[in-house]
Amino acid sequence: MPESLMNIRVDRKAFAGNTVLQDIDLSLQSGEIVSLLGPSGCGKSTLLRIVAGLEQDFRGSVDNIEGEVAFVFQEPRLMPWLTVEQNIGFSDDAGYDRRWVGQLIEEVGLSGFADALPKALSGGMAQRVAIARGLYSHPTVLLLDEPFSAVDAFTRMKLQDLLLQLAERHAITLLLVTHDVDEALYLSDRVLVMGSRPGTITQQLPVGLQAPRDRRDPLLARLKAQALTELHQAHII
């Protein structure tokens, strides 16, 4: 059994008196990839913000965090006046490590773009910068909020494969929010299905695909059918 890295419990999270999350009990294991799958408004992004420490007003706890936690948002949120290199090292008040930034630029496939401004980048390239920025602090856990929803299908597949490579290379744990059943199954070791009103985890689906993953694997089709059945049973679709 992998080492438990983080325990997340949300008894209740409310906005303006309305309960948006309830009875969440989740543990993350070292090195695993977990997806939160569910409809809009079920509290997936709110749960991610709680794990990141961006939401403090809730009843519950986030325990046993070891090391840094980094966040990759749905939009890259790059500083338009900073270069790719500067955007990646932006959070380092002491002055960023140019060698480390250069390595990350190479790892995310942007060699030759260190001095480029965001306006010169495609959407997929900008999101590669955002992922590199998330990795800059050597996080133990990387949180991703629908990171590939704004790119085309072919770019999305390339970015998914890149994410798997980076997770393995850096031995990090990923917690990912997505609306895409195929993406959740392809990337994850576990898929957690969330229902809404209030948001809670209704189903847990172990994936069990071996690396390297193959989109043509018949197991993916069987898992998708199972996931869709569970989404129907939870009245999510």
Swiss-Prot record:
ATP binds at residues 38-45. InterPro entries: AAA+_ATPase, ABC_transporter-like_ATP-bd, ABC_transporter-like_CS, ABC_transporter_ATP-bind, P-loop_NTPase. One of its GO terms (cellular component) is plasma membrane. It is found in: Cell inner membrane. It is a peripheral membrane protein. It is an enzyme of class 7 (translocase). It catalyses: ATP + H2O + aliphatic sulfonate-[sulfonate-binding protein]Side 1 = ADP + phosphate + aliphatic sulfonateSide 2 + [sulfonate-binding protein]Side 1. SUPFAM superfamilies: P-loop containing nucleoside triphosphate hydrolases. Its EC number is 7.6.2.14. CDD domains: ABC_NrtD_SsuB_transporters (cd03293). The keyword Endoplasmic reticulum does not apply. Its main location: membrane. SMART domains: AAA. It holds the Pfam family ABC_tran. Residues 5-221 form the ABC transporter domain. Keywords: ATP-binding, Cell inner membrane, Cell membrane, Membrane, Nucleotide-binding, Translocase, Transport. One of its GO terms (molecular function) is ATP hydrolysis activity. Part of the ABC transporter complex SsuABC involved in aliphatic sulfonates import. Responsible for energy coupling to the transport system. Belongs to the ABC transporter superfamily. Aliphatic sulfonates importer (TC 3.A.1.17.2) family. The complex is composed of two ATP-binding proteins (SsuB), two transmembrane proteins (SsuC) and a solute-binding protein (SsuA). This is Aliphatic sulfonates import ATP-binding protein SsuB 1. The gene is ssuB1.
